[in-house]
Amino acid sequence: MRILITNDDSISAPVLPFLIQWAKKLGEVTVIVPKFEQSGKSHSIELHKPFEVLACDRFPGVRTYTVDSSPADCVRYAILGLREKFDLVISGINRGYNIGTDILYSGTASAAFEAVCLGCKALALSTGFEEFDTALAHLDEVWEMLQKHDLFAKNDIYNVNIPEGEVKGVRFTRQGGPFYSDEFPSIGDNLVRPTGICVYKDSHDYSVDTDAVLHGYISISPLIPQRTNMPLFHELSKLNP
């Protein structure tokens, strides 16, 4: 299996070497990651200026590039720039959960979406802000579940969030609602500083990614890049001549 690893936390992400070692058990690994932190870049790509791509030898025996652009551009460069094919794109492990509507802003999730748009299977991995040990300890369990149920034959992208601390089990989930929002206090000189605030409301519905993760369950959500409201489309299409 040929595997591409990317992220939005950059080449300096502390968990990256550990994820690489785990992925090497699955196949041949290539790493193409942002040169600098790219959290919150969503699905942005660079259209108006060139960006730097550098080969580096940070991880012995693993071909590695840094890209001075977004996570989506890392995937685009790997597939369209290098003209290579990958069986799986792994994005992460992100420092911070990508659940609820935060998925829309996530560079981690968007890199996985870009991979799917370019014909690959993709896995987005995230955990909390405090530690990565729990996530690393449960990667085998997540992978075995994906393989046991042949899930990549049923969907192209899975968004996986692994809670910190004690893990109670695994739940297949759907995307939840808002988790964070922002306030914009003025800091003078016509500047405002976006300040995240938690707006999550617990519904104790463990079929929702936000509730599942915050109650100690690994959340596995099948996502799609398609944004059409298909039930409404089928209804409206009857009005077409």
Indicate residue ranges for each PLM-predicted region.
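Glycine-rich phosphate/pyrophosphate-binding loops
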Residues: V116-L136
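Electrostatically charged, flexible surface regions
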Residues: L136-P241
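Alpha-helix C-terminal capping segments
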Residues: A78-R83, A112-K121
